[in-house]
Every structure is written in C-alpha cells, then in structure tokens.
A protein has these predicted regions:
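Position-driven detector of the extreme protein N-terminus
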Residues: 2-3, 28, 40, 90, ...
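Short alpha-helix boundary/capping segments
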Residues: 1-10
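Extracellular, repeat-based ectodomains that mediate carbohydrate processing or recognition
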Residues: 70-431
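Bacterial N-terminal signal peptides
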Residues: 54-66
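Bacterial N-terminal signal peptides that target proteins for export
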Residues: 40-57
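Repetitive helical segments and hydrophobic/amphipathic motifs
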Residues: 10-13, 22, 26, 64
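Short hydrophobic targeting helices and cationic amphipathic motifs
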Residues: 18-22, 26, 33-37
Length: 431
C-alpha cells in the first residue's frame, strides 16, 4: 500500500466571493508561566492579526493514497467575536453552533449571553444568532465551565450551562423550528454541593440526559457524577440520580463528557480522584429505563488513561460517534491529548506531539462518513489564554494522515477549538 503523504498544504483566506487568496498570518504567543508542563519560555514573531470577525481560513489538505483524494479543513473564527464555541451535528447532517458573546468589546468586560446558530453550507456561513440564555451572566474564564449542547430527534436544541455565583446549572431548549429558546430553568436541587465545572448534555430521540459532578470540594475522593433524564424531549426530567461510584471520587475542576449509545445506554467520561491523586479518565456506561438507573459499569483503564496528580489539572474532554455508531473519546493525560474508542476493549492511543514542549489541552473530535477522524486542541495555554491551535487527522484504520499542519492560529482568551463534519464530508474547525 502506498503511504499517505501530505501533497498540498496551503493556508488560504475565503473571501465573500468564495475566491481563494494566499495568506501568511503569524500570531504572537507570549510565554506561559502558568502552564506546569511548559519548561521553557518562548516568543513568536507577529506581523499581522486577523481583524475581521468571522473571517475564514481554509487549510486545503491534499492526501495521496493511490489516486488523489482531497480533504478540506475549513478553519474559521467563531462568528460575532464569540468565544467558547461548541459544535454538534444532528442525524440529518445539520451543523449547530453554541457560543458565548460579551455584551461589550472592552477587554475587561465579562457579561454576555449564550447564542445559537445553524450552519448554512450552501452559503458557507452561519445563520442569524438566537439568544439562548434568558439573562446575561459573567463568562467563566476557564474552559472547564463551558456550556454544552445536544440536538434531539425532533430537532430541538438542548443547552446546559453553569453559573458559579448561583452555584447552579441552567437548562433551556429550543422549539422544534429552532427559532427561539424557552425560559431557562435550574437543574440541581439535591446534589449541588461543590459545583465547580460545567455539566454536559446528551440527546437521542426523545431522550435527554444532563450529567454533572458534585460533592464536597475538600473531599474529592468522595465526589461522583449525578444526572437527570428526560424521555419527553426535555419537557420534564427525572429526580436527580447518582450515576457514578463514590469510591472513585471525581475531580472537582475537570469537566466531563456524555453521549447516548442507544436510548437506554449512556456513556460518561470523567476524571476520578482516587485518594485525591488518582485522576484517571474513567469510562462509565449507565443502563437505564423509564428514568431509572438499572446498572452501571466501568471499563478497564489503559495506561494512557492513568494520571497521578495531587492537584486538579482543569481538563476537558469530548465524545463523538462515527458512521458505525462507535463512540470515540478524546482527553488529556499529563499534558498530552489521547484518543480512545469506547467499548472496543482496546487501549487509548496518543494523538500527536506538540509544536514545542508545552501542554496540550481542550480537545475536540469529529469523524466523517469515510471514517477520517479529525482531532483539534490548544497548546501553550493558561487559565485564560486559549493558546495555539493544533490538529491531527487519522484514517478510519487508525493510520496517520499526517496533514502537516503548521499554521500559527491563536485561539482567543477564554476560548478553545471545536470541530464538526460538513455535509460534503469535509471538516469545519472554529476557534
């Protein structure tokens, strides 16, 4: 078999007339003293910044395997000057975007709202914004507190987000036309102690699940994950249910990811806190029926899921599904991004080395119908800085497509990347 090589790698700007023009933007990444993995200071020269909100960068990736086949990765700023983008694709192939937008452009401003947009592939842009949050709130500068989104079988968009001042998660859903969102409502009453990171939400058919971590912050080894389940598209939810084992603990300031395997099976990936130091990536599968949990099981840990650390790493992870309904998890261990096919009984695998010796963080994953798997993340981050965008592309068989991405794209403060598959099988990346 002929090896896969990067035949063409060019970064181009897509203008309003969809013509392609070469660019050579170089952006400054300042030293990162808060990054515990970064051992050396570094400086990047800068000669230009992206100045137009919503400007699109295209990375054309020519991949050779016998005959030429071209995969395209469109790299685009989050619309509206927004940050913390979340992308999801529904069963019909529609791309949905959730993001936070500040009300004022001043650097010190924090207050704003969540907005939703649907991607219009024929026009290569997102549609008009629709406000999600009923009241404005201050953005959390940590990625772990990000909002989450899922799309149900009837077309409704379901959103959950975290407000630390209220020590509460809030939920809202759209109408089936996705033209407006209902008044936000609180999620937690019983298991609300020690909320310190974002919840996640999943949907399939008429089922919706909201999952979060809770418990005393001073006793991480006794925390666990909880959830509420709806079987009527979010109209009503179950009582709050304990879903995880308290024997494993739960890292207080790491977010989690959840996804439905089928209408009665929920996958939850979260970081434990065994004896306060075993911050391993746990893969929990919960079986339930009629809003009641019937059973739960943990998958055996592989080496790359294990992380001994006495402090909280403030990490995030992401789950998506391929064309064969296999669930894929991307996560961080010791400053490196890893990938794992859930339920396959195989070990987690590393993704790629960083540009320089520094920390990789906040991964997202998207998989097209051919099985090509794109993983994106940030590097040289801090608590507030998004860092430098990096990515890696894998073929369906796990082989490395080695796109050779070397672009210097700076992720905005407080933000992280997101990825989705376009209807034509190409990829969209927001930052």
């Amino acid at each position: 078999m002929m090896p896969i090589t990067a035949a063409v790698i060019t970064v181009r700007k897509v203008c309003t007339n969809l013509g392609f023009y070469s660019t050579s933007h170089r952006m400054k990444l300042p030293p990162n003293p808060l990054d515990y993995c970064a051992m050396n200071k570094f400086t990047r020269a800068t000669n230009a910044r992206l100045s137009v909100a919503g400007q699109i960068l295209c990375l054309l990736l020519g991949l050779l395997l016998g005959s030429a086949a071209v995969a395209e990765i469109r790299i685009q700023e989050t619309p509206d000057g927004g940050v913390q983008p979340r992308l999801t694709v529904d069963d019909s192939g529609n791309i949905h975007l959730l993001y936070f937008k500040k009300r004022l452009s001043a650097p010190s401003a924090r207050e704003g709202n969540l907005y939703y947009r649907q991607y219009l592939p024929e026009q290569n842009r997102f549609g008009l914004p629709i406000k999600v949050s009923s009241t404005a709130y201050d953005i959390r500068t940590f990625a772990i507190a990000r909002a989450s989104m899922a799309v149900g079988g009837d077309g409704r968009v379901h959103v959950v987000w975290y407000l630390p001042r209220e020590n509460q998660y809030f939920y809202s859903r759209s109408n089936t036309e996705r033209s407006q969102f209902e008044m936000q409502q609180s999620v937690v009453e019983k298991f609300g102690e020690g909320l310190d990171a974002g919840a996640d939400i999943a949907a399939i058919g008429s089922q919706v699940a909201i999952v979060w971590g809770a418990g005393a912050l001073s006793s991480e080894h006794e925390r666990t994950v909880y959830g509420r389940i709806s079987n009527d598209s979010g109209a009503t939810f179950s009582d709050e249910l304990q879903m995880g084992s308290k024997e494993l603990g739960a890292c207080a300031c790491c977010s989690l990811a959840t996804n439905f395997g089928d209408e009665n099976e929920l996958a939850i990936a979260y970081r434990s806190a065994i004896e306060g130091v075993g911050r391993h990536m746990q893969a929990l599968t919960v079986q339930f029926a009629d809003k009641t949990i019937e059973s739960g099981r943990y998958a055996e840990l592989s080496e790359l899921q294990e992380w001994e650390l006495s402090a909280c790493p403030l990490s995030t992870n992401d789950i998506t599904v391929d064309a064969d309904d296999n669930q894929w998890l991307v996560f961080e261990t010791e400053g490196r991004i890893n990938q794992l096919q859930l339920g396959a009984g195989i070990d987690a695998m590393p993704v790629a080395e960083p540009f320089i010796k520094t920390r990789q963080k906040n991964p997202a994953v998207a998989i097209n119908s051919e099985g090509d798997r794109l993983i994106v993340w940030g590097e040289a981050i801090s608590h507030t800085r998004g860092g430098r965008l990096n990515m890696h592309l894998f073929a369906a068989d796990g082989s490395d497509k080695n796109v050779g991405f070397t672009g210097e794209v700076s992720i905005p403060k407080f933000s992280f990347p997101a990825a989705a598959v376009l209807p034509d099988g190409n990829f969209l990346v927001l930052y």
